[in-house]
């Protein structure tokens, strides 16, 4: 079962837990009762979402949230909140008077499911969903760790 740390009993709404059958339905996750879905748009459902035991209503893979609208990517700027990160998007803005570009950025708060391990500096892909709180309107769909980025400078291979 999931870690019950809240006062209310945490469970997935589409899974019946009081089955009289023995064996298979005892624990969620691998071989047990667990609701998960394919969100489409070319994103694979993480293995942790299928086999894990976490309960998260705002998760796009195991919760009741659908992804629609914009798909954005950026860098994780802050991961200090619980299940929420700040995604920084850098862009260039053209100044007509000087005929040059200036650097600008925007910070977007996004909900991160427990099936992802996100640290500062990781590249993340986020998708728009319904408002999850006062400021959060996006959900993390994919994480690329900071060290394994295929985009960037290649190391010198030698002679």
From Swiss-Prot:
GO BP terms, alphabetized: translation
PROSITE patterns: RIBOSOMAL_S17 (PS00056)
Superkingdom of the source species: Eukaryota
GO cellular component, one term: plasma membrane
InterPro entries in the cross-refs: NA-bd_OB-fold, Ribosomal_uS17, Ribosomal_uS17_arc/euk, Ribosomal_uS17_CS, Ribosomal_uS17_N
Pfam families named among the record's database cross-references: Ribosomal_S17, Ribosomal_S17_N
Molecular functions per Gene Ontology: mRNA binding; rRNA binding; structural constituent of ribosome
Keywords from the named record: Cytoplasm, Ribonucleoprotein, Ribosomal protein, RNA-binding, rRNA-binding
Disulfide bonds: none
Name of this protein: Small ribosomal subunit protein uS17y
